[in-house]
Every structure is written in C-alpha cells, then in structure tokens.
C-alpha cells in the first residue's frame, strides 16, 4: 500500500505532528566498553564549575575536597556551583511562609515512616555497589553481603529487621578501627575437557577473609560506583550514572521520603506524580496564570533548560535545607536525615573498569584497571584522555576520585525539586513587590516558567530576576537552550502544551509489539498497551484497530502460530494443522494455537482465554487450563501480573495486565553458561536465599503471614511454627503418634545445631 506521507498531515494542526520528530523508533543506542572516560568527564566538569571554591583535606581519608559554597557571585553567564547558604535558607523560609506547617507535617509523616520501614526496603532497586566485593551486584545480594559482614564484626542491630537499626550498624561500623570482610577471589587452572579433549581454563570462585583498616573501610563506604547510562535517545554522547553502596542507600531513602512528602503538598512540583495527574497539575498552573492575565497583562512561558543540574547542585546545600526543614524536630531524627548529605559531601566516585588497550596488529589486548591510572605513563593515551587523567590525578585514591561538589545523576530528585520550587514560590506579587510576577513547574532539573507583566519590559525584568535568583541557589538556567513563547505553547517533561496537552504518541512506540515473556503474557500485554493508549494518548479507533492487526501479525510471526488454515509453512504448522482439523469449534482456539483473532477495540480488556472460553471444545478447555496438566505453569499466578514496558524516556515502568494460567504461561529456564563464570558463587548465594525464602513461605503461607514480631531469627520462627502445627495435627488425629515424635525430634536437633554453631 503506497501512502504519500504529506497527505497524512493535510488536516493535522502542526503542533499535533510534534511526535513525528522524536527519535523513538528503532533500537535505542547502548554503550559498550567502560564508563571510565564518562566518569572522568563528570568529575572534571564538576570541579571546573566550582573551581573558585576552597580546597580542604578530609581528615579520615586524606582525600582533597573542593567546597564552592558561598563562593564568588557570578560575573558572566557561565554555569557555576556557588550557592549562597543564606539565600537558600531564606528561600526555604519563604516557602514555609506560603505553605504554613508544610515542613512540620512532612517531618511527622516521615518520622512515622522511619520507625516502620524494614530493611528489606533496600532490596528494591537494581544494581548496587557491593563494597565487600568492590563491584556491582543486585541490591538484594549486596544487602545480604553487607549484613553478613556486619554480623562478622559484631554489629547485629539490623537483626530486628528495622531499617533504622541497620543504619545504626552503619554508623557504628564507621567508628571501628578495622573491619573484617568476606570477599571472593578467583582461581584459574588449566584442565583437559573430557568431551573435546582440549585444554580449557577453569575458573573457580573461593571466599576468603580480609581485614580493612578504618581508612580503607570509610573510603569504600563513601564510594559510588559508576556505569554508563544506556538507551538514551537523541544524544550523541553517553554519560555516567552512579550506583551508590548500601551504607548510603538507607539514608538517602529517608531524605527522599521527607522531600517526597513536601513535594506532594506543592502545586508547582511535577514529582512524585506522573501521567494524567501531572498533566492536571500543569493545566491548573497555566489556567491560574491565564485567568489572572486576562486583558491588562501579557503572559509568557519559558520552556526551561538548566545547564548541568546535578553537577552544580551541592550536598552541603542540601544539608542546610534539611537543617532548616527539621529545625524543631527531635535530635535523633535530625541526625538520621543529615547523614546522607554529609556522606555525599565526602563521596568518592569509582572510575569503573578502566581502559582497554590493544596493539596495532590486534594480537595483544590488555586492561588497565582504574587503580593504575594514578601511576601509569601517559604516553600510551591519546590527547583527550591524557588531559582527563592529568586533571583527575590529584583527586585519585585507590581507583576512586574524590568528588565533594555535585550530586551524580538521580540521587536527590525530590529534594532538588523542593529547591527549584522554592524559587518559583518567590514569584508571587507580594514577594516581587513590582508589576511583574511569575509561577511555574519544576520536576527535578526540568522546569517551565510562566511570567506575567503589563508590558514586554516587565516580562524581561521578571525573567532576569528569576535567572539571578537561580544563580544564588546554584541553579544555572541555560540562556541558549531555554526559549520563550506566549503562554499557551510550551513543553515540560516531554509533555507538549498547546492550549491543552498534545498527545506525544511517538513516546509510546517502543512499548508496542511482542514483549517476549511467553505466549500468554505477550498477548495480554500487547492488547493492554493498545487499550491504555486509547485511554491516555489519543490513539483513535481506526489507528487502534490497525495497531491491533499489526500486533496480531507480529505475534503470529514471533511464535510461528499462523492460523490452522493458512498456507504459511513454519516449524509449528504441522502440529497446528493437526489441532485445527480435530477441533470442532475452531473459533475457540487461542491465537497461539493457530486460532482466529477475536479481539477488536471493544473487548481489549478481556483476557483471551475468557473471551473464547464459551467457544472452546471441552477437551481443549481441559488441556489448556487443567492444573493437573504438567505444562500449566504452577507459579501461583496473581489475577494481575506486572510487565515491564519501556517508555521512551524515564525508567522502565511496570504495567499491569490480566494473567490467566494456561499451558502457554511457561517460564524459560536460566541460561546455564553463567555456571562456568566468576559469577557462580553469587548464583549459589542467590539459590540459597531462594531456598530459604521458599521454605519460610511453606511454614507461613501468605494467608497467615504476619511479619514475625520480636527478634526471633527465621529458623527459630519456623521451628516454633512447626511445633505448634504438629501438635494441632496430632491432637486432631491428622498425624500418627510416631510422626509427631519424629517432628519434635527433628526440631530439637535443629536447635542443638544452632547452639553449637
């Protein structure tokens, strides 16, 4: 079918075609190799923005540190990190004046959270720097390793299960003269492979104990590992992101809880809400500015961009904010919240894997780890890398760079939003005391500023005042990248506003298509994505119908399940034809079994099994959904499952879809090749956790599952539960006397073993 693309736009207002200009089709770019160069860029840039600050030396680690706070006021438009403490505190005071009691209430809410949060909160999240192994690990493993090592050193407060008690352990660990850790090491040996009779290198992982002195431990506790941010669209250069360790994570969580609670009460904050709720918030601010500007005033909107938001923020400023926000609160609470910014003021950025070199004729390859960069001869490097290394050398300690100023990406999104909103708050007429006034929206580093004034000069004056106020708080509005329009047309966090929000449909494109989980989930996710886009993103009925047809086609090609009466030959077509011929009611066959598609845009909300149930042959029903059929997935499937869909920007978000357990909801097995790598020890740990958790769930089925109260360990809880259950079963005659005696004996044996250990 030939379509002339210009015809598509004849009836479309230009602003609705915005989505065709977004770089969202095709695969996003991924980074390869090491992030060392990007991390060095970040460290060097951050120091450059604050270069006129004061240098000091950290007494514990000996790391040189740059403090730009209350530094010189800017003389030009170059980005700088010289925030002024008194200005930040005053902005906070004005924010509180406009919202009486906001800080007080948020502190009370947070205090409650602090006392109730459990350690397992820290298992959420992806990669975490594991300080015991000096590399990244999944969050749950890193937490377990940390707690294991703490226990080895006599720090056991975290066994209560409360996060706040784990943080007490962290604080105490910093005072210890030495920490004993369990770390992994690799042994390589050459062995002859039985099958191929060739010599192969076999790696084994062993565990060994090692002692860290106070300085080494503190350096590790303050270290953020860095990786390259993947899949960023519309950018030529990659950039580095930070993965903090377990010591920092818990403290950051509480600070962000407080900041989130404040953001929820601020109408100018684009966080923590999202989607339609965020659009409603935005529309309210715009409406307010438009109605007030009626005939007498002009109203203009800046689509704002800040230069290097993270690299000019400063943890010391966040400490000042927290000190102010919590000023009437109990001492313990203030201490807990001030630790995160203090740790960030003393942070070390790990430079990642280092550089890979290969000789001209590609014969030799060698890895130069980051630890060696401080001493290696620089003639091997090209000019740009040489400059980077020279610049960063004075800051290096053990392969990590001292990085006191700057925040690293994604750490204090909520708190930095509070800082941004405090400037927007200063735009009220009673504060500006002039003819112009402003309001706007802030979401992390993204902002939209609406300025009202009687004439153009007033607008200009308002923008200038906003710009200068930002500078005083360490925020640098980019004059090159921000642009101004009559209010009614602007962009904020990729929402395009033109007298109402324009659907930016291209952003959703990556989530269309077959996810590749399994036949059952993929069908469900595919139709749910289409349904959601009809609700939220102006996907019209005709386009939705077409999307559905394309999806079904894609699905059939992916799983080779073309209709039973098709001519297409695939690996599965023989089986599918056989099933088709022996089925009486062909409409009842699932698409993945070669059946017809019964979906249209009216019934997308119904899972396919339910949609076709009445049409199925009874023996087909019996095979498809019979719990005794070994191929029906026996995972306890909730009625709602979560899939991860990739929107075009921001983190992968989870989307709910209906799940019906059938023979098609299989779960693929783990790839075995991991068993031969250095990760094997970790895998064994993970399997051990899995087994323990499964066992625990057998004793405490979810219906009766209350969090164990008191400080009993998992084993103690299970033993006492086993005794109670056995007694009940024995007294009601469900088990014989011999069985009861046997169970009691096993329980006693377990307790004896625990005592001996």
Swiss-Prot record:
EC primary class: transferase
Origin organism lineage: Viruses, Riboviria, Orthornavirae, Negarnaviricota, Polyploviricotina
Region (Promoter-binding site), start-end ranges: 249-256
Span of the annotated motif Nuclear localization signal: 187-195, 203-216
Gene3D superfamilies, sorted: 6.10.140.720
InterPro entries membership: RNA-dir_pol_NSvirus, RNA_pol_PB1_influenza
Task of the protein: RNA-dependent RNA polymerase which is responsible for replication and transcription of virus RNA segments. The transcription of viral mRNAs occurs by a unique mechanism called cap-snatching. 5' methylated caps of cellular mRNAs are cleaved after 10-13 nucleotides by PA. In turn, these short capped RNAs are used as primers by PB1 for transcription of viral mRNAs. During virus replication, PB1 initiates RNA synthesis and copy vRNA into complementary RNA (cRNA) which in turn serves as a template for the production of more vRNAs.
Its EC number(s): 2.7.7.48
Location, primary (coarse class): host cell
Keyword set, alphabetical order: Eukaryotic host gene expression shutoff by virus, Eukaryotic host transcription shutoff by virus, Host cytoplasm, Host gene expression shutoff by virus, Host nucleus, Host-virus interaction, Inhibition of host RNA polymerase II by virus, Nucleotide-binding, Nucleotidyltransferase, Phosphoprotein, RNA-directed RNA polymerase, Transferase, Viral RNA replication, Viral transcription
Similarity section: Belongs to the influenza viruses polymerase PB1 family.
PTM notes: Phosphorylated by host PRKCA.
GO molecular function, one term: RNA-directed RNA polymerase activity
Region of interest called Disordered, as start-end residue ranges on this chain: 52-78
Subcellular location, record wording: Host nucleus; Host cytoplasm
GO process terms (BP): DNA-templated transcription; symbiont-mediated suppression of host gene expression; symbiont-mediated suppression of host mRNA transcription via inhibition of RNA polymerase II activity; viral RNA genome replication; viral transcription
A single Gene Ontology CC term: host cell cytoplasm
Subunit structure: Influenza RNA polymerase is composed of three subunits: PB1, PB2 and PA. Interacts (via N-terminus) with PA (via C-terminus). Interacts (via C-terminus) with PB2 (via N-terminus); this interaction is essential for transcription initiation. Interacts (via C-terminus) with human PKP2 (via N-terminus); the interaction competitively inhibits the interaction between the RNA polymerase subunits PB1 and PB2.
Annotated Polar residues bias: 55-64
Record's catalysed reaction(s): RNA(n) + a ribonucleoside 5'-triphosphate = RNA(n+1) + diphosphate
Superkingdom of source: Viruses
Pfam families the record matches: Flu_PB1 (PF00602)
Domain named RdRp catalytic: residues: 286-483
Protein name listed in UniProt: RNA-directed RNA polymerase catalytic subunit
């Amino acid at each position: 079918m030939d379509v002339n693309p210009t015809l598509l736009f004849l009836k479309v207002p230009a602003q609705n075609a915005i989505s065709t200009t977004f770089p969202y089709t095709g695969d996003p770019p991924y980074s390869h190799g090491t992030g060392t160069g990007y991390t060095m860029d970040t460290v060097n840039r951050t120091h450059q923005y604050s270069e006129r600050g004061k240098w000091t030396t950290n007494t514990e680690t000996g790391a040189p540190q740059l403090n730009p706070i209350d530094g010189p006021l800017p003389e030009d438009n170059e980005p700088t990190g010289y925030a002024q403490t008194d200005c930040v505190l005053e902005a906070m005071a004005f924010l509180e004046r406009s919202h009486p009691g906001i800080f007080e209430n948020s502190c009370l809410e947070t205090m409650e959270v602090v006392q109730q949060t459990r350690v397992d909160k820290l298992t959420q999240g992806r990669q975490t720097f594991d300080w015991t192994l000096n590399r990244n690990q999944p969050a749950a493993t890193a937490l377990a390793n940390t707690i294991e090592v703490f226990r080895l050193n006599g720090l056991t407060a975290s066994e209560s299960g409360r996060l706040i008690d784990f943080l007490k352990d962290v604080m105490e660990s910093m005072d210890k003269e030495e920490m004993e850790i369990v770390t992994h090491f690799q042994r390589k040996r050459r062995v002859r492979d039985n099958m191929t009779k060739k010599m192969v290198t076999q790696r084994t992982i062993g565990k060994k104990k090692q002692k860290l002195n106070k300085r080494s431990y503190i350096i590790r506790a303050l270290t953020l590992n860095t990786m390259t941010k993947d899949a960023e669209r519309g950018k030529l250069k990659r950039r580095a992101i930070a993965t903090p360790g377990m010591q920092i994570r818990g403290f950051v969580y509480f600070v962000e809880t407080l900041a989130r609670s404040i953001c929820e009460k601020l109408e100018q904050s684009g966080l923590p809400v999202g989607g339609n709720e965020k659009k409603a918030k935005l529309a309210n601010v715009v409406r307010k500015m438009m109605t007030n500007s009626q005939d007498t005033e002009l109203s203009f909107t800046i689509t704002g961009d800040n230069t290097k938001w993270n690299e000019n923020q400063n943890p010391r400023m966040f400490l000042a904010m927290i000190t102010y926000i919590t000023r009437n609160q109990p001492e313990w609470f203030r201490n807990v919240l001030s630790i995160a910014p203090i740790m960030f003021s003393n942070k070390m950025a790990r430079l990642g894997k280092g550089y890979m070199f290969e000789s001209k004729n590609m014969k030799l390859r060698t890895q130069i780890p980051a630890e060696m960069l401080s001493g290696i001869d620089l003639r091997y490097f090209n000019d740009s890398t040489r400059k980077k290394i020279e610049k960063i050398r004075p800051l290096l300690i053990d392969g990590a760079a001292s990085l006191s100023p700057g925040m690293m990406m994604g750490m204090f999104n909520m708190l930095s939003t509070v800082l941004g909103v405090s400037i927007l708050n200063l735009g009220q007429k009673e504060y500006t005391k002039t003819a112009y006034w402003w309001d706007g929206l802030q979401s992390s580093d993204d902002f939209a500023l609406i300025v009202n004034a009687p004439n153009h000069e007033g607008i200009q004056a308002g923008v200038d005042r906003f710009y200068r106020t930002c500078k005083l708080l360490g925020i640098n509005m980019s004059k090159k990248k921000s642009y101004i329009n009559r209010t009614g047309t602007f962009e904020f966090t990729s929402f395009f506003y033109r007298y109402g929000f324009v659907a930016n449909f291209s952003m959703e494109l990556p989530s269309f298509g077959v996810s590749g989980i399994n036949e059952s989930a993929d069908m469900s996710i595919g139709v749910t994505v289409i349904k959601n886009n009809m609700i939220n993103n102006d996907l019209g009925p005709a386009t939705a119908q077409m999307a559905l047809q394309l999806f079904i086609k894609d699905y059939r090609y992916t799983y080779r399940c073309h209709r039973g009466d098709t001519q297409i030959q695939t690996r599965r077509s023989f089986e599918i034809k056989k099933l088709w011929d022996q089925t009486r009611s062909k409409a009842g066959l699932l698409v993945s079994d070669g059946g017809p598609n019964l979906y249209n845009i009216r019934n997308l909300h119904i899972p396919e099994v339910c949609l076709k149930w009445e049409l199925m042959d009874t023996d087909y029903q019996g095979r498809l959904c019979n719990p005794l059929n070994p191929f029906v997935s026996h995972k306890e499937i909730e009625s709602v499952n979560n899939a991860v869909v990739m929107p075009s920007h921001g983190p992968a978000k989870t989307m709910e879809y209906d799940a019906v357990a059938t023979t098609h909801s299989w779960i693929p097995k783990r790839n075995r090749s991991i068993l031969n790598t250095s990760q094997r020890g970790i895998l064994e740990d993970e399997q051990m956790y899995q087994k323990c958790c499964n066992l625990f769930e057998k004793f405490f089925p979810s219906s009766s599952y209350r969090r164990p109260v008191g400080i009993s360990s998992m084993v103690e809880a299970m033993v006492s539960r086993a005794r109670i259950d056995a007694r009940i079963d024995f007294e009601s005659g469900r088990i014989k006397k011999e069985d009861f005696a046997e169970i009691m004996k096993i329980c006693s044996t377990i307790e004896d073993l625990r005592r001996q250990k």
